[in-house]
Amino acid sequence: QMCIRDRGLLVPDELVVDLVVDRVKADDCRNGYVLDGFPRTIPQAEALDKALAANGEKVDYAINVEVPDENIINRMSGRRACLSCGATYHIVHIPTKVEGICDKCGAELVLRDDDKPETVKKRLDVYHEQTQPLIDYYTDKGVLNEVDGTKDMDEVFSAIVDILGA
């Protein structure tokens, strides 16, 4: 049986909310934390808001890194993984010395199931259907910031640091 991730589906809300809420109660989150890829749905966002409010906290910033679907499909379908040592590469951005062979251990590289274009397209469909409404949700709360994700990594990072005032 394929796992949820390999089918391009989202993990059930209840499980994710419980895990995140437990995690942000830890001592190392006392001075703040960044949630990457969560919440992904309105019910998750509402559950997070409720849980944070119970601790006298709230979401201070929501950042949407905007990247066209075509760019995402191209980026992800270019990723390659070594199943032997876990190293990751990209055929354009992080190429190997010998095409298709891991620089670290010499094993053959693979395109993971969740990076295949058809799986990425399914994940993007799920994103647009379930996650897109969060943009409106956080805009209405006055905490949404948008960053152009087509720029190079350093520029995207700098834009996020500027937003967070870090």
Spans of features found by a protein language model:
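Residue-level signature of catalytic and energy-coupling elements of molecular machines
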Residues: 20, 34, 63, 72, ...
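ATP-dependent NMP and nucleoside kinases share a basic, alpha-helical "lid"
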Residues: 28, 38-95, 139
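Cys/His-coordinated zinc-binding microdomains
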Residues: 86-88, 101, 106-107
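Loop/turn-to-beta-strand initiation segments
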Residues: 29-33
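Short, small-residue-biased leader/transition segments that mark boundaries at the very start
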Residues: 2-4
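NTP-dependent small-molecule kinase module
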Residues: 108-166
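Conserved alpha-helical scaffold flanking the Walker A/P-loop in AAA+ ATPase domains
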Residues: 17-27
